[in-house]
């Protein structure tokens, strides 16, 4: 490492070149001091390469000489003095005068100190940044930079769809953005085509491992059925019950994708459900036919009695008409009851486990919990205040540790509510349509 640099000015009364001056320095200092022969010092690395910068001014040559030195301060000063002893370059008089010995380490330290001051000043001026702002900025950047349009249908997708050997198929653009936010770039959306699967999706599903990732509600099941019937899907992932893919956290996404169900198994499960539904419909139809047959028998009996009494009174056919009306009414009631039961089953299927855990928690406390359509808790109030809470805040579902009353059902219907979960129901004169009661065991 160079410790010092000797800087000297040179002036020669004649037209000389740089190598002439360097040769004169070595030649005229040789033999002056035995231990300070410049050639030997250079060979040992004690001094560096001598640099000369010249300019011509008429018949004169003027310039600067630089000699790097690894010697100590005293020895460097001695070399500097030796330079000044040179008084000729070739046949021309010359003058060399040392103007400065630069301490390289000191200069380096000086630069370090100045730079440290600049860094500290800049650092002091910068304000501390909120981590939430950083995360938001990164998130927004990810959204804007990574979302692409793929295929002739211009489907919302991530940049990894083309290069990855696995794709994740979701329903819409918002689902794609949410998965991109958490680093899943091999995602593509149906683009609103929930009934007819786009050709681009079909083609990708044939070429790659395809994962269908759908919402945890009835709509998600419908999308899944269409995908399984029209595209070559390998695995199925579902959001937690009652939740949509676009609202999931990183942990929920990872959990859903780690619990993949083979598409073949999911098809079997869906077929079983459809078979059970068909059997239930068949059973209801058979019961309705039985009721109808019984009423027809009654109708015939009434008709026979009517013929016998025809001479005594008019309108003998009225009982027949009444019997038919009753049969039709009974059949209609049975169908309505069955339809309501099916709807309740569908709603119960998508109630999160956390709600049932909450039901255990509030048992015996006479409290009520109001939920929105995403099963987020809107409010938790005493059971006696539940009606006013529904009127004020509205609710998709209510978990009620108390008696479910007519007033409660009416207010839920008025506010667009759908479910009431509880253990006891009071005498209800009229149950509003669209509001369903789930009795907990």
Curated annotation (Swiss-Prot):
GO molecular function: DNA-directed RNA polymerase activity; metal ion binding; poly(A) binding
CDD domains: TOPRIM_primases
Family: Belongs to the archaeal DnaG primase family.
Subunit and partners: Forms a ternary complex with MCM helicase and DNA. Component of the archaeal exosome complex.
Domain (Toprim) ranges: 165-241
Domain of life: Archaea
UniProt: Mg(2+) 2 binding residues: 215, 217
GO biological process terms, semicolon-separated: DNA replication, synthesis of primer
Positions annotated to bind Mg(2+) 1: 171, 215
PANTHER family hit by this protein: DNA PRIMASE
Catalytic activity: ssDNA + n NTP = ssDNA/pppN(pN)n-1 hybrid + (n-1) diphosphate
NCBIfam families the UniProt entry points to: PRK04031.1-1
Ranges for region Disordered: 299-320
Originating organism: Ignicoccus hospitalis (strain KIN4/I / DSM 18386 / JCM 14125)
Gene name of the record: dnaG
Keyword 4Fe-4S attributed: no
Enzyme class: transferase
Described function: RNA polymerase that catalyzes the synthesis of short RNA molecules used as primers for DNA polymerase during DNA replication. Also part of the exosome, which is a complex involved in RNA degradation. Acts as a poly(A)-binding protein that enhances the interaction between heteromeric, adenine-rich transcripts and the exosome.
Enzyme Commission number, as recorded: 2.7.7.101
Cofactor(s) demanded: Mg(2+)
Swiss-Prot/TrEMBL keywords: DNA replication, DNA-directed RNA polymerase, Exosome, Magnesium, Metal-binding, Nucleotidyltransferase, Primosome, Transcription, Transferase
GO cellular component, one term: DNA-directed RNA polymerase complex
Cofactor stoichiometry and binding remark: Binds two Mg(2+) per subunit.
Compositionally biased intervals (Basic and acidic residues): 299-315
Protein name: DNA primase DnaG
């Amino acid at each position: 490492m160079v410790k010092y640099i000797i800087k000297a000015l040179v002036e020669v009364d004649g037209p000389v070149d740089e190598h002439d001056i360097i040769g004169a320095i070595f030649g005229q200092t040789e033999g002056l001091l035995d231990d300070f022969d410049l050639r030997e010092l250079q060979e040992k690395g004690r001094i560096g390469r001598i640099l000369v910068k010249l300019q011509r001014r008429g018949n004169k040559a003027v310039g600067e000489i630089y000699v790097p030195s690894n010697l100590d301060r005293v020895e460097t000063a001695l070399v500097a003095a030796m330079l000044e002893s040179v008084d000729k370059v070739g046949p021309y008089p010359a003058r060399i005068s040392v103007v400065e010995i630069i301490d390289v380490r000191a200069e380096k330290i000086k630069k370090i100190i100045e730079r440290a001051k600049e860094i500290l000043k800049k650092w002091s001026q910068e304000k501390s940044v909120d981590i939430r702002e950083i995360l938001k900025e990164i998130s927004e950047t990810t959204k804007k930079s990574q979302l692409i349009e793929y295929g002739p249908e211009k489907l919302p997708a991530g940049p990894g769809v083309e290069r990855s050997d696995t794709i994740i198929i979701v329903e819409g653009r918002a689902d794609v953005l949410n998965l991109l936010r958490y680093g899943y770039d091999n995602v593509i959306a149906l683009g609103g085509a929930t009934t007819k699967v786009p050709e681009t999706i079909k083609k990708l599903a044939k070429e790659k491992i395809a994962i269908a990732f759908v919402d945890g509600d009835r709509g998600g099941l419908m999308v899944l059925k269409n995908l399984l019937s029209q595209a070559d899907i390998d695995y199925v992932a579902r959001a937690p019950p009652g939740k949509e893919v676009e609202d999931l956290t990183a942990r929920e996404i990872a959990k859903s994708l780690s619990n993949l169900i083979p598409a073949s198994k999911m098809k079997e499960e869906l077929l079983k459900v459809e078979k059970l539904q068909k059997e239930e419909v068949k059973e209801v139809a058979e019961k309705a036919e039985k009721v109808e047959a019984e009423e027809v028998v009654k109708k015939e009996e009434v008709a026979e009695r009517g013929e016998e009494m025809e001479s005594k009174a008019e309108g003998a056919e009225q009982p027949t008409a009444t019997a038919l009306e009753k049969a039709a009414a009974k059949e209609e009631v049975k169908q309505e009851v069955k339809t309501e039961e099916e709807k309740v089953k569908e709603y119960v299927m998508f109630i999160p486990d956390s709600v049932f855990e909450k039901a255990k928690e509030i048992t015996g406390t006479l409290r009520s919990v109001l939920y929105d359509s995403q099963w987020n808790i809107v409010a938790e109030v005493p059971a006696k205040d539940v009606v006013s809470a529904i009127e004020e805040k509205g609710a998709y579902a209510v978990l009620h540790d108390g008696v479910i009353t007519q007033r409660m059902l009416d207010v839920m219907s008025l506010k667009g509510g759908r479910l009431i979960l509880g253990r006891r129901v009071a005498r209800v004169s009229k149950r509003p349509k669209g509001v369903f009661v789930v009795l907990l065991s």
